[in-house]
UniProtKB/Swiss-Prot annotation:
PANTHER family (alphabetical): LOW AFFINITY POTASSIUM TRANSPORT SYSTEM PROTEIN KUP, OSMOTIC STRESS POTASSIUM TRANSPORTER
Reactions it catalyzes: K(+)(in) + H(+)(in) = K(+)(out) + H(+)(out)
Protein name: Probable potassium transport system protein Kup
Pfam families: K_trans, K_trans_C
Location (main, coarse): membrane
Name of the gene this protein is made from: kup
Family: Belongs to the HAK/KUP transporter (TC 2.A.72) family.
Cystine crosslinks: none
Entry's Gene Ontology molecular function annotations: potassium ion transmembrane transporter activity; symporter activity
Transmembrane segments: 56-76, 109-129, 141-161, 174-194, 209-229, 253-273, 295-315, 343-363, 372-392, 400-420, 425-445
Organism encoding this protein: Methylibium petroleiphilum (strain ATCC BAA-1232 / LMG 22953 / PM1)
Function: Transport of potassium into the cell. Likely operates as a K(+):H(+) symporter.
Superkingdom classification of source: Bacteria
Cell compartments where the protein resides: Cell inner membrane
Amino acid sequence: MHSRSSDPPTGSKLAALTLGAVGVVYGDIGTSPLYALKEVFAHGRIDITPDNIYGILSLVVWTLTVIVSLKYVLLILRADNNGEGGLIAMLALASTAVKERPVLRRRLLILGVFGTAIFFGDGVITPAISVLSAVEGLEVAAPGLHRYVVPVTLVVLTLLFAAQRFGTGGIGKFFGPVTAVWFIVLALLGVVHIVENPAVLAALSPHYALAFMWQHPGTAFVSLGAVVLCVTGAEALYADMGHFGKRPIRLAWFSLVMPALMINYFGQGAMLLQRPETVKNPFYEMAPEWALYPLIVLATLATVIASQALITAAFSVTKQAIQLGYFPRLRVTHTSVKETGQIYVPFVNWGLYACIVLAVVTFGSSSKLASAYGIAVTTDMLITTTMTFFVIRYSWKYPWALCVAATGFFFLVDAMFFAANAIKILDGGWFPLAIGAAMFTLMMTWKQGRRLMSERLREEAIDLKSFLESVFISPPTRVQGTAVFLAAEQGSTPNALLHNLKHNKVLHEQNLFVTVRHHEVPWIPFSKRCEIESLGHCCWQVTLNFGFKNEPDVPEALALLRGRGVQLDDMETSYFLSRDIVIPTIGKGMAIWREKLFCSMHRNAAAAADFLNLPTNRVVELGSKVEI
């Protein structure tokens, strides 16, 4: 069970959480200096003049300030769902707040699911562009090494994904310190060049950004598509709130991450003012020649850590989507006996790996991948801002004017960045959108298919109480032990019970009819886990409640019934499940291609017994057919 102290962390605990947040939360945004400023001036779209450099630096500073410091750190971190963050947590919060408005709720659900789907597109681009940009330092060290950039990147990524099944428990403790060293190095690299040209600090004034946009509106608009790269990974501040808490995340941002990023960007700008020819790779050009290879190694470590944080998030988001009914059950392996959150999902791991390899081979450089990156990031930002509005309005009950004031400005900023990236869809933006569209189709097809299945089963269902009354008019033979029948719908007779009576003609001494419910809250404590109703004749109707971050462990939950009149012996308990075979039919439910897709997903889903942590040697599965 997840437990969280209500007291904010202080002292050594706060320091440890802050250092942990540096490694996990800020890995992605911390590697942006590798490619963000380089990409703004790439392809000769923007001339490298002092006015343009000042304007771009000012845009970078105020983009970091508005989107990260104001929007995420000060506003969105307040929209927690029982202490948890992330798009799924916000989706659950917003949809619960508007449950009295079914049309609006459905639209929000679709929007939230699309945002979650786009996250997987973002998850493909982030490791690809991060590791590529780090390894591209080899080109600066020795131009002849250019041909090794893609192969070395693929080797690093292959090792990273192959290591996932072992978990990160052992090496995870080094993520924070290594990333902290990375941020210190970012600041040191920048300081050297700022000292040489301190006039660059004038770009802290927003008037340079405004003047740049006023004097060169077309150029400024195009530049926004690359400037947004400086805030990639900002959504991790909210997504990882449940792991570290608001205070450590805010402290890490204002005390280390934001200053280091700004110093590094200004250092790159100061160098470009003096040596415009370094624009090809300003990050690595800042380093003295003797430090290049150590810097490449450190950058590669930092990008691997950033990628690891995203892979872990992908596992977590997938598990939450499964429990909320938007994805079929997948095999989930726990990689730590101490931390329930440390999981490994093989299907997601190798699916991500295949798409990332495809991205690296197809695009071949961080510069080409940058065109694909922005659209995924800005789409998620827009969706998060939209969801925040509905949380403020319907969950916090703030007046309309205040809600619009709180989110309207951020929505306009996000929309501007989104529009600047939308013009790059044909240049690569299609890639994460295609992945997102595929994931969205899978998720909505699964949700709709499960709904159709439930409707069909409900139509054919027999009321459990009435059925038991008829059975006990002429009672069958009772055998020793306890039978646990898993039922999708509370109060309906499980098909497994019907088949058991039909073929075996016996009933156990004790019978539990168990329905597992996943709720739109992250955590449900043990005290609210079980609801039990006696049906007579040593039969009980049991409802088990889980949050979308709880571990759905049925035997552990049923053990709570021992003090409530039910005698459970693990070695005398059998679990009966219905294994439904889905038949697609023309003229009902969904389009036939979606029904066939759903059938395939259903057929290949992991067994319910594994997902619910049932002991495999005590499970009996009985099949039935369902037409949708």
